[in-house]
Amino acid sequence: MVKPIIAPSILASDFANLGCECHRVINSGAEWLHIDVMDGHFVPNITLGQPIVTSLRRAVPRSQEEEKASGEVARPTAFFDCHMMVEEPEKWVADFAKAGADQFTFHYEATKDPLSLVKLIKENGIKAACAIKPGTPVDVLFELAPYLDMALVMTVEPGFGGQKFMPDMMPKVEALRTKFPHMNIQVDGGLGKETIGVAAKAGANVIVAGTSVFTASDPHEVISFMKEEVRKELKAKHILGDETKH
């Protein structure tokens, strides 16, 4: 069983006020933060590295239990979903696990041995996910999926935010949902109120949304709308899980 998850992409946030921006979207209903890591090689853009994740983890702890143990005033908590658009992702696993990542999403196209990489990620105590670019066929994930915590179908070309959603990627989502009904399936790129219905109907339950959330005058309304669209489709497919569990 799966539940609706909205993961605002911090690539669309005001980096001068990153901690406050993250608190704002978490307080608006987001449980995950999507952290895009780009190296300028696998994709042409360069974004951020593990020092930012380390700093952000201090501002956004994993859980209230962790907060209570520290004795500090409770702050918003979130799951850190690190999307690694990098060459040789293997060499970054330990650093990002130490920095505070909860999930390490590598690109299928960036590694020669995806199964060994999944094992390495899990040995470092975090969740493992695999992403595919728009030009990569979905069936490359079928053998790997039983070992994954999540699959990511890119709905734009990776590397830059603010691109238009590619609806022709939805058959990939449908194929994954049919074969793996209880798996987290994420879509990333161009998601907002206008496109969420198509993605939800295809079977996506983890929605990366950047500009549509961070630039909204009312991010709570946007997040709530998208969650409800996903919830309706998961319920119709009889795979809606308990949303009180984290």
UniProtKB/Swiss-Prot annotation:
Reported cofactor(s): Co(2+); Fe(2+); Mn(2+); Zn(2+)
The protein's name: Ribulose-phosphate 3-epimerase
Catalytic activity: D-ribulose 5-phosphate = D-xylulose 5-phosphate
Annotated function: Catalyzes the reversible epimerization of D-ribulose 5-phosphate to D-xylulose 5-phosphate.
InterPro entries (alphabetical): Aldolase_TIM (IPR013785), Ribul_P_3_epim (IPR026019), Ribul_P_3_epim-like (IPR000056), RibuloseP-bd_barrel (IPR011060)
Family statement: Belongs to the ribulose-phosphate 3-epimerase family.
GO biological process, one term: carbohydrate metabolic process
E.C. designation(s): 5.1.3.1
Residues given in the record as a divalent metal cation binding sites: 34, 36, 83, 188
Active-site residues, Swiss-Prot/TrEMBL: 36, 188
Residues holding substrate: 9, 83, 159-162, 188-190, 210-212
Pathway(s) of this molecule: Carbohydrate degradation; pentose phosphate pathway; D-xylulose 5-phosphate from D-ribulose 5-phosphate (non-oxidative stage): step 1/1
Gene3D superfamilies: Aldolase class I
SUPFAM superfamilies attached to this UniProt entry: Ribulose-phoshate binding barrel
Keyword Zinc attributed: yes
Keyword annotations: Carbohydrate metabolism, Cobalt, Iron, Isomerase, Manganese, Metal-binding, Zinc
Recorded GO MF terms: D-ribulose-phosphate 3-epimerase activity; metal ion binding
The record's free-text note on cofactor binding: Binds 1 divalent metal cation per subunit. Active with Co(2+), Fe(2+), Mn(2+) and Zn(2+).
A Pfam entry, by short name: Ribul_P_3_epim
